[in-house]
Amino acid sequence: MARRGQQPPPQQAPPAQKNQTGKFNPAEFVKPGLTEEEVLEIKEAFDLFDTDGTQSIDPKELKAAMTSLGFEAKNQTIYQMISDLDTDGSGQIDFAEFLKLMTARISERDSKADIQKVFNLFDSERAGVITLKDLRKVAKELGETMDDSELQEMIDRADSDGDAQVTFEDFYNIMTKKTFA
């Protein structure tokens, strides 16, 4: 309670990321050209890059996220992105701000060559496929601890022929939303 003559601190509205039951509600973020499934995918990426679990991404986390998605991420660019998107002045990006950034970036990078570059980041052995081992390596490089079942689920969602590997065609189809399991 505020003392007499003092104003109580301003109350910030909680992020619209969770509904009354405390669960993330992708429907709150759906807009023309963006499906619930796409919102969920971006939320998964957000959670992956929010390595400290604060429900916001700081400059270090944003740089790792952009680099892993195949974008050049110079410090000046990162700070400019945060400045451009940080509507609440926190110096960090919350999910709504991240969603705005990623939907803009995704529309810019749909060319096959750009998608190939991203695929190559994951295909560390240049075998032409992304395996569980490849995903494990990427997660480790990002400082993310994910168990094999979570990583395998990612592979299973993209793998069209059930061989436990993601080909470039599988990856391209997921990235361009031609298929989504």
Swiss-Prot record:
Molecular function GO terms recorded: calcium ion binding
SUPFAM superfamilies: EF-hand
GO CC annotation terms, alphabetical: cytoplasm; cytoskeleton
Compartment(s) where it occurs, according to its Swiss-Prot or TrEMBL record: Cytoplasm, Cytoskeleton
Alphabetized InterPro entries for the sequence: CALM/Myosin/TropC-like (IPR050230), EF-hand-dom_pair (IPR011992), EF_Hand_1_Ca_BS (IPR018247), EF_hand_dom (IPR002048)
Swiss-Prot/TrEMBL keywords: Calcium, Cytoplasm, Cytoskeleton, Metal-binding, Repeat
Domain of life of the source: Eukaryota
Binding partners and assembly: Monomer.
Family of the protein in this entry: Belongs to the centrin family.
Physiological role: Plays a fundamental role in microtubule organizing center structure and function. Component of the infraciliary lattice (ICL) and the ciliary basal bodies.
Name of the protein described by the UniProt record: Caltractin ICL1d
Organism encoding this protein: Paramecium tetraurelia
Gene that encodes the chain: Icl1d
